[in-house]
Amino acid sequence: MREQKDLGLLILRVAGFLLVFTFGIQKIGWYWSALHAGKSFSSIGLAPLIAKMGFPIPVALAIWITFNESIGAFLIGCGFLTRLLAASLALGMAGALYTSVRLGEDWLRAALYLIIFITLILTGPGKFSLDHLLKCKKSPGAC
């Protein structure tokens, strides 16, 4: 039974990574294009939307969101720092859910991602993860 739970958590982690990572890569593309066009981060991508909605430090928030959805999602897929990064992504998805509802846009995707990351906060990454491997290496009796 434990193996099935761990396999389910692996599938959930990898699915969460694949679904969210596509948005992170898209955002990296926006910023890469902006840099090559001589534009600033504040003029392209998420930062103008964040500023328009009245959130503070829009450039920093845009960079944090991009990190979450790219590197953070990849590390969750690997099962590394899972709970910490899932908490960061859940916070970002809560913001995306709020923004989607406020703008009258489709909010279901943000809600689904939020559920995935809250589940990973509560359960942890499971046995098939780098977190588990590092835990076993540090304390062999705990595995």
Model-found features: residue ranges?
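Extended, low-polarity transmembrane helix blocks
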Residues: 1-37, 51, 56-67, 71, ...
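Cytosolic, membrane-interface loops and tails of multi-pass inner-membrane proteins
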Residues: 44-50
